[in-house]
């Protein structure tokens, strides 16, 4: 049954639901039900169209940015006049529209142009899903206007800094720096995964045409686009640093940025080069200018006698592989004296010095020494190739895979996955294991914890991930957003029911949509910026997500402050800084439900009322 806009509106006025007592409270920022006003300035009466949002992003200031579609009087979604697509940033009551189709391009550059894509208006603004630490937003899309030719120079990327006017970064057919007239490709729009830093710079791989382009010899480049002059990082056919007689072709994927530090991969070209030794890994970290090759496929691993970087596969990189100090984290397949029992490792490199953080065959606390026969004697195999994240303070969070001690894979349905963390001091922690009970949910256990958790971590030492779960007795499935840190341990932030064709008891939170949600989505492995931080989970603990009850067609975007001291005043239900009659009314309205549960026991009751009255007055 569809929830009325009145119900949703009443919920928004309360706006919050207590999560775990130590964390903050969920704030619903936007509701898409086709009826609740979007609250966008200058667009009176507009409502969000259900199921049209991309993943929201959030900066250190807690402001959220996302793209979506609107409907209402004077709004159309077809043809050349479509004006239904917007990119916004802010909070309820203070949204800023950064871009809208059939409105001027950001900063009116190029002059007189509008954002428009007649053939595909829903994509006239590209969902770049990126925000810098300080709140700068990437904008990208298609345009029409003076001097614009469709399919030639009608795409562009802009940057809206945290303060000040937006700037044009790149446009189709711009001249590539460091070349004699070679041009950027026609399509200069950017999508998810672009790593923009707070200056407005981002590495961008592109094909080149015209000018001094010579067939396939030099027809591609990796460029650092940004305000002012772009910078050529490497062009296809450039000399390989430190390897005379060889050239490099930069790869079209896997380019990473943290401030001014760049890391990327490429392929060598030259006499004697084969698929066994052609992959190289380059960075400018540790240099005052230029690039260096810090590792090559088939070479010996410096500092580890007998080990080589095996030629069976290239390195894989997690979400934020390059740290502030230039340390690069990667997963490598090892050769030489390595065997099938220990031939892969999570490694780091800093200025030529290599370290092994985790290696295949290592013991895992809570698994190798477990009394549970499902885990006893099992050892570490590998992390998920992209489901891992190194924070700036040295915490390595990962989705882990375990194996039998003899190196054989664990046969399904036996549990073979876990979520773990390696602390900065080297301590290995098992956060949770596949088949473990879900804390606080009787009868529920974790399903596989590999490949779909959207794991993220921040500089405060908090790890957040989305885990699937099951209640086999009840025949139900669902998912939970979990948080973990050393101080507070493992706890649930939100939960969702799975869709079912048979009657079942909904387990999803009603926090977000007023009805039990069946979808909760984190931004995933693309949620990283060029400042070394996350875009869905900020370095100071702000987390944002999408939640939905697709049965009733209700969708929402919400945020929460996660981590120790995330909520110093849980009795402040409406978040206005004072515990007063409004908070009492909100608590009484939720009596007997799970919201707002001040003490985290799952029910709003007399204990919560006592806690609220004891905290009456200004929050500390």
Task: Please annotate each region the language model reported.
Residues 1-23:
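Sec-dependent, cleavable N-terminal signal peptides
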Residues 563-620:
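Cellulosome-associated attachment modules in secreted, modular CAZymes
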Residues 21-567:
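Conserved "turn/edge" positions that cap or connect secondary-structure elements
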Residues 4-7, 275, 473, 595, ...:
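Aromatic-enriched hydrophobic runs in primary sequence
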Residues 2, 193, 319, 570, ...:
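Exposed boundary/loop context
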């Amino acid at each position: 049954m569809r929830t009325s806009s009145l119900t949703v509106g009443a919920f928004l006025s309360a706006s919050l639901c207590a999560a775990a007592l130590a964390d903050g409270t969920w704030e619903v920022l936007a509701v898409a039900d086709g009826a609740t006003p979007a609250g966008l300035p200058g667009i009176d009466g507009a409502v969000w169209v259900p199921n049209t949002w991309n993943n929201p992003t959030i900066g250190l200031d807690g402001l959220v940015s996302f793209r979506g579609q609107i409907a209402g009087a004077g709004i159309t979604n077809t043809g050349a006049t479509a004006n239904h697509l917007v990119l916004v940033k802010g909070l309820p009551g203070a949204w800023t529209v950064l871009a809208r189709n059939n409105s001027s391009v950001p900063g009116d550059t190029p002059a007189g142009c509008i954002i428009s894509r007649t053939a595909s208006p829903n994509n006239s603004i590209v969902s770049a899903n990126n925000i810098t630490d300080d709140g700068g937003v990437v904008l990208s899309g298609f345009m029409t206007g003076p001097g614009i030719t469709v399919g030639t120079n009608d795409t562009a990327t802009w940057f809206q800094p945290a303060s000040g006017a937006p700037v044009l970064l790149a446009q189709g057919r711009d001249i590539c720096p460091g070349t004699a007239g070679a041009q950027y490709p026609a399509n200069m729009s950017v999508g998810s995964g672009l790593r923009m830093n707070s200056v407005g710079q981002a590495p961008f791989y592109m094909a080149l045409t015209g000018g001094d382009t010579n067939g396939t010899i030099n027809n591609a480049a990796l460029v650092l686009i940004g305000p002012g002059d772009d910078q050529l990082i490497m062009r296809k056919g450039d000399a390989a640093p430190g390897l005379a007689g060889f050239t490099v072709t930069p790869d079209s994927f896997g380019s990473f940025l943290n401030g001014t530090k760049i890391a990327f991969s490429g392929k060598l070209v030259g006499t004697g080069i084969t698929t066994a030794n052609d992959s190289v890994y380059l960075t400018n970290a540790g240099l005052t200018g230029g690039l260096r090759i810090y590792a090559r496929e088939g070479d010996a691993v410096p500092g580890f006698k007998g080990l080589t970087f095996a030629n069976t596969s290239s390195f894989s990189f997690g979400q934020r592989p390059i740290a502030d100090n230039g340390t690069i984290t990667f997963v490598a397949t090892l050769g030489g004296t390595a065997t099938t029992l220990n031939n892969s490792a999570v490694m780091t490199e800093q200025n030529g010095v290599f370290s092994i953080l985790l290696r295949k065959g290592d013991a895992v606390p809570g698994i190798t020494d477990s009394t549970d026969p499902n885990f006893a004697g099992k050892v570490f195999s590998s992390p998920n190739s992209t489901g891992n994240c190194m924070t700036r303070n040295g915490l390595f969070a990962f989705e882990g895979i375990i194996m039998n001690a003899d190196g054989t894979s664990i046969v399904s349905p036996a549990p073979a996955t876990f979520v773990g963390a390696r602390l900065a001091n080297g301590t290995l922690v098992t956060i949770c294991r596949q088949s473990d009970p879900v804390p606080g949910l009787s009868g529920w256990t974790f399903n596989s914890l590999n490949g779909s958790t959207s794991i993220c971590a921040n500089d405060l030492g908090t790890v957040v991930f989305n885990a699937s779960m099951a209640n086999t007795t009840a025949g139900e499935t669902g998912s939970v957003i979990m948080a973990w840190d050393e101080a507070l341990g493992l706890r649930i932030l939100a939960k969702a029911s799975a869709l079912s064709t048979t009657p079942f008891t909904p387990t999803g939170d009603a926090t977000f949509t007023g009805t039990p949600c069946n979808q909760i989505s984190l931004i995933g492995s693309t949620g990283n910026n060029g400042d070394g931080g996350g875009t869905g989970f900020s370095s100071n603990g702000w987390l944002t997500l999408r939640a939905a009850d697709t049965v009733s067609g209700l969708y929402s975007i919400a945020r929460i402050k996660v981590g120790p001291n995330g909520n110093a005043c849980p009795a402040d239900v409406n978040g206005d800084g004072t515990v007063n009659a409004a908070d009492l009314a909100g608590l009484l309205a939720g009596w007997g439900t799970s919201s707002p549960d001040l003490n985290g026991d799952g029910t709003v009751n007399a204990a919560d009322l006592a806690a609220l009255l004891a905290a009456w007055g200004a929050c500390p």
